[in-house]
């Protein structure tokens, strides 16, 4: 990964975590689709025959395809979130770690500089330093298995 891709990955962390939580709720949680919520019926509607409560094969197949797609996306984001979280351990220097954490939260350079009481240019230089550390360590490539292995 190049420097810009690593920076984008760190900046994307905050929304990827939210998406991982959402996908986990959908795939593993007790999320009930609104169309399956029961609605009380009265009068003639209550006595009329209802359709089959089961789903057709096409609906089941489509649901499986959707769940498979969501599962793949979940794994993709989980790998990236994990890599970004472990990246914090590879960074040296307390201010570098604070800047890294602030970037993970989606803070802008301006907000980080106000938070730390330093200039935006200093924040940018320090960001470049720790991204260089991560590039030299090949941290993200190893965790994300982006390099192709020779067979």
Curated annotation (Swiss-Prot):
Please name the InterPro entries in this protein's record: RNA_pol_sigma_r3/r4-like (IPR013324)
Domain of life the protein comes from: Bacteria
Member of which family?
To B.subtilis pcf and to sigma factors.
According to UniProt, the name of this protein is Uncharacterized protein YqaQ
Protein source organism? Bacillus subtilis (strain 168)
């Amino acid at each position: 990964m190049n420097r810009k891709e690593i920076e984008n990955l760190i900046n994307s962390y905050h929304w990827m975590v939210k998406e991982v939580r959402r996908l986990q709720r959908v795939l593993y949680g007790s999320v009930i689709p609104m169309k399956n919520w029961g609605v009380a019926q009265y009068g003639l509607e209550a006595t009329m025959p209802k359709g089959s409560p089961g789903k057709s094969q096409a609906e089941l197949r489509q649901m499986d395809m959707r769940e498979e797609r969501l599962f793949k996306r979940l794994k993709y984001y989980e790998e990236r979130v994990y890599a970004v979280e472990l990246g914090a351990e590879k960074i040296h220097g307390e201010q570098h770690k604070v800047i890294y954490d602030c970037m993970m939260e989606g803070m802008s350079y301006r907000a980080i500089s106000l938070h730390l009481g330093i200039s935006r240019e200093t924040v940018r230089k320090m960001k470049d330093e720790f991204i260089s550390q991560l590039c030299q360590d090949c941290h993200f490539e190893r965790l994300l298995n982006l390099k192709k292995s020779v067979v």
